[in-house]
């Protein structure tokens, strides 16, 4: 990975990130964070890997005939026509297990670009490496060790561990502020990979990388699952956004690249993507009717949409008050839906009300007084009914 075809899509994704950021901020991004999952890169033959390389200004060299990647080639600045962007990857545990050669390829690319004798304003990787390695030398590391440590850009879980820790934290309500979410994200994800180093815990270095990010990215190559149907999206990408917000003190620009249609690759902001899925799926009557055909599981999945929306809001501020109001209206207040939920899965209805009330309690949603009162009524009513059922069975 990546294949020549994936390289072309990766270049398009990279160009769109840069163009979008310039249109919003008026300058090039110096540092970009990208989430790399194994399944997506297997399906797309390495599109996200290609984007990582392209942002650095490095292209793969392919073996004639087999098209296997056999090396790397620096794209000259005259050809690139832009600065080399510094890229940090948060890899999944499965990516670590299934793509060790790709991790080493990306690590080599960073080291290659860092060694180039180029103007620092044309090579942000070198700019950051020079500054960070000097700091590490001042802390007592040798020049060689300081350079190596400053150059780590591939981070993930320690060996044998999977996940980002964020979903469990939010589900358990075990947090008070964005700083708590960031702390968990760093603790789980600050294990560096590259060369002979396989999972060295470097929280200070990972925090520095997160605190420098101008942009965060997670790309999608299909619509089978999305950021509201699974909590993994928020755990990895939302967690990264939360880390930047906490450490840097301001939110990054955050994008979702969509390459489901290879002829029309598009780049949405996280907020735009959340609203797109919210309108087209979550509150779409056809979607709700479809879920109602699946009984207990359909009800549980609907509750998950509310939960994942709330979790995204906690990390990335993607929800607006009207969206929470719509969830309350369409999922919990609608007589037909409410009756069905009470029949097939009252626990899901109780969870929906509980999450919506938590969003209000945490200040993520300024609920209308009548909406809040109705949600409290539903929660207590279902709780009473479930207690009666429990008493009958005991």
Q: Where in the sequence are the language-model features?
A:
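Ligand/cofactor-recognition surfaces for anionic moieties
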Residues: 1-394
């Amino acid at each position: 990975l990546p294949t020549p075809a994936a390289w072309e899509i990766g270049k398009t994704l990279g160009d769109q990130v840069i163009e979008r950021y310039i249109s919003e901020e008026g300058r090039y991004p110096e540092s970009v964070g990208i989430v790399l999952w194994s399944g997506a890169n297997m399906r797309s033959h390495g599109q996200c890997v290609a984007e990582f390389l392209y942002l650095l200004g490095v292209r793969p060299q392919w073996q004639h005939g087999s098209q296997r990647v056999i090396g790397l080639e620096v794209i000259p600045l005259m050809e690139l026509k832009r600065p080399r962007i510094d890229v940090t990857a948060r890899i999944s545990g499965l990516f670590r297990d299934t793509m060790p050669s790709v991790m080493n390829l990306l690590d080599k690319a960073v080291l290659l670009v860092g060694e180039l004798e180029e103007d620092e304003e044309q090579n942000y990787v070198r700019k950051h490496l020079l500054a960070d390695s000097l700091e590490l030398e001042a802390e007592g590391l040798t020049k060689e060790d300081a350079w190596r440590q400053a150059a780590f850009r591939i981070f993930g879980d320690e060996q044998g561990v999977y996940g980002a820790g964020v979903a469990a934290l939010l589900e358990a309500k075990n947090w008070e502020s964005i700083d708590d979410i960031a702390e968990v994200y760093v603790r789980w994800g600050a294990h560096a990979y590259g060369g002979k180093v396989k999972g060295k815990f470097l929280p200070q270095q990972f925090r520095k990388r997160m605190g420098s990010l101008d942009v965060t990215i997670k790309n999608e190559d299909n619509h089978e699952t999305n950021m509201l149907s699974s909590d993994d999206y928020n755990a990895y990408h939302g967690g990264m956004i939360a880390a930047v917000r906490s450490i840097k003190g301001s939110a990054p620009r955050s994008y979702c690249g969509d390459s489901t249609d290879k002829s029309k690759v598009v780049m949405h902001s996280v907020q735009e993507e959340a609203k797109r899925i919210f309108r087209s799926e979550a509150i779409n009557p056809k979607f709700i009717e479809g879920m109602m055909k699946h009984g207990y599981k359909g009800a549980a999945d609907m509750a998950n949409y509310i939960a994942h929306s709330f979790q995204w809001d906690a990390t990335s501020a993607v929800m607006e008050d009207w969206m929470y109001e719509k969830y309350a209206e369409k999922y919990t207040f609608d007589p037909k839906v409410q009756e069905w939920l009470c029949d097939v899965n009252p626990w899901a209805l109780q969870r929906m009300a509980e999450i919506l009330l938590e969003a209000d309690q945490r200040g993520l949603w300024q609920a209308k007084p009548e909406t809040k009162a109705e949600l409290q009524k539903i929660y207590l009513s279902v709780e009473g009914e479930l207690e009666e059922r429990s008493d009958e069975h005991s």
